[in-house]
UniProtKB/Swiss-Prot annotation:
Belongs to the DTD family. One of its GO terms (cellular component) is cytoplasm. Gene3D superfamilies: D-tyrosyl-tRNA(Tyr) deacylase. Pfam families: Tyr_Deacylase (PF02580). It comes from Methylibium petroleiphilum (strain ATCC BAA-1232 / LMG 22953 / PM1). Its main location: cytoplasm. It is found in: Cytoplasm. Keywords: Cytoplasm, Hydrolase, RNA-binding, tRNA-binding. It catalyses: glycyl-tRNA(Ala) + H2O = tRNA(Ala) + glycine + H(+); a D-aminoacyl-tRNA + H2O = a tRNA + a D-alpha-amino acid + H(+). An aminoacyl-tRNA editing enzyme that deacylates mischarged D-aminoacyl-tRNAs. Also deacylates mischarged glycyl-tRNA(Ala), protecting cells against glycine mischarging by AlaRS. Acts via tRNA-based rather than protein-based catalysis; rejects L-amino acids rather than detecting D-amino acids in the active site. By recycling D-aminoacyl-tRNA to D-amino acids and free tRNA molecules, this enzyme counteracts the toxicity associated with the formation of D-aminoacyl-tRNA entities in vivo and helps enforce protein L-homochirality. One of its GO terms (biological process) is D-amino acid catabolic process. The gene is dtd. This is D-aminoacyl-tRNA deacylase. Homodimer.
Length: 152
């Protein structure tokens, strides 16, 4: 799975002018499933998100996880993270999982996250969403998790 996480002081997602998810301080996580991903990969991504130390400690160093900082997670599906722009001016999204597989993995990711942390908010899979955020830092980190890969 491909994730782009941003440390935020606040974030929300809206669909058709209706607020569907909102957090205060925490992580906004844009996520995309790839065809080779499984439920175990989604679980591994949640583990990484909850343990990654991107929040400041009392000395000002990034040494606290979202759990330790008491922050929220706002998880939003975004298949465009799998874009391949190497073949011209129009991106290809063939690196993203098919929609139904993506939906199943997104729901697994949410269920696992909610079983291990609170609050966990989300966007609406497949919807045209407006994501509003105040980036804190800014801290923006790409994260790729899979059976054969773990970056960074």
């Amino acid at each position: 799975m491909i994730a782009l996480l941003q440390r935020v002081s606040q974030a929300r997602v809206e669909v058709g002018g209706r607020r569907v998810g909102e957090i205060g301080p925490g992580l906004l996580v844009l996520v995309c499933a790839e065809p080779s991903d499984t439920g175990a990969v989604a679980d591994k991504l949640v583990e990484r998100l909850l343990k990654l130390r991107v929040f400041s400690d009392d000395a000002g160093k990034m040494n606290r996880s979202v759990v330790e900082a008491g922050g929220g997670l706002l998880i939003v599906s975004q298949f465009t993270l799998a874009a391949d722009c190497s073949g011209g001016n129009r991106p290809s999204f063939s690196g993203a999982a098919p929609a139904e597989q993506g939906r199943v993995l997104y729901e697994r990711l949410l269920a696992t996250a909610r079983s291990r942390h609170t609050p966990v908010e989300c966007g609406e899979f497949g919807a045209d969403m407006q994501v509003l955020l105040v980036n804190d830092g800014p801290v923006t980190i790409p994260l790729v998790v899979g059976h054969d890969k773990l970056r960074p």
